[in-house]
């Protein structure tokens, strides 16, 4: 069920806005920073990418940028690039099993168009809480914190007080949810299907990550993920200017 955050949380979010620019700034004392493709602020991740690059020189093996049009109304946040997925292709969720499930659901709910192996996003952007491949797919708290400035910038791009249509953040997995929640001052614990109105025209929705492990154990199914994105579709379309707005791709 939809659970609004406290009035205090919403007021704190709004108080962190630069009202002249209409942008959300310094959420949780994190200054939004545009993504840097040459970022090397996490020594452990830099060393890991260097070592993977030696074994797989054809792989991307670098920080992975957010994918999708800046004017999109939905931001999807995962955990981190997968070894043979985004770390190989350079695009979030592209090239592995979790991405195949995600993109099939996005296509079914109107957020992507698939033609053979080609994928075009429609009205959404995709990123990760950590932009570099972590060892054992487990980023440290410090690495998550260092990457949070980029996530804050993505949230700034998604929503401002000037927007006239609903915007939505979809957090895939507890770690991504925690990183987004910290920036937005959301206190609600992670729960699959949780739907939280952060401020006017901005909603956060939580889902289990569509990882191979979660799918194989039945923690998440295609039907469950489809339900999540149908709710997202209903929300972003249910606003006065949604149907006339450009959704990008």
Predicted segments with their positions:
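A polyanion-binding, active-site-adjacent surface
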Residues: 23-190, 194, 198-237
């Amino acid at each position: 069920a939809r659970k609004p955050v406290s009035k205090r949380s919403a007021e704190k979010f709004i108080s962190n806005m630069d009202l002249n620019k209409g942008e959300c700034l310094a959420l949780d004392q994190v200054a939004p920073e545009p993504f840097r493709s040459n970022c090397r602020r996490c020594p452990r991740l830099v060393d890991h990418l260097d070592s993977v690059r030696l074994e797989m020189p054809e792989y991307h093996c670098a920080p992975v940028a957010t994918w999708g049009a800046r004017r999109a109304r939905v931001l999807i946040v995962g955990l981190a690039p997968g070894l043979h997925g985004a770390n190989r292709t350079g695009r979030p969720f592209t090239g592995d099993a979790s991405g195949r499930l995600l993109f099939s659901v996005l296509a079914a709910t109107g957020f992507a168009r698939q033609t053979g192996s080609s994928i075009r996003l429609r009205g959404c952007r995709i990123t990760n809480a950590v932009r570099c491949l972590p060892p054992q797919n487990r980023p440290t708290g410090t690495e998550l914190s260092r990457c949070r400035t980029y996530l804050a910038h993505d949230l700034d791009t998604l929503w401002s007080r000037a927007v006239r249509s609903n915007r939505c953040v979809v957090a895939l997995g507890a770690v991504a949810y925690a990183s987004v929640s910290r920036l937005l001052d959301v206190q609600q614990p992670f729960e699959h299907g949780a739907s939280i109105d952060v401020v006017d025209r901005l909603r956060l929705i939580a889902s289990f990550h569509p990882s191979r492990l979660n799918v194989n154990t039945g923690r998440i199914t295609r039907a469950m993920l489809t339900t999540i994105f149908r709710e997202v579709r209903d929300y972003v379309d249910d606003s006065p200017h949604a149907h006339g707005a450009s959704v990008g791709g």
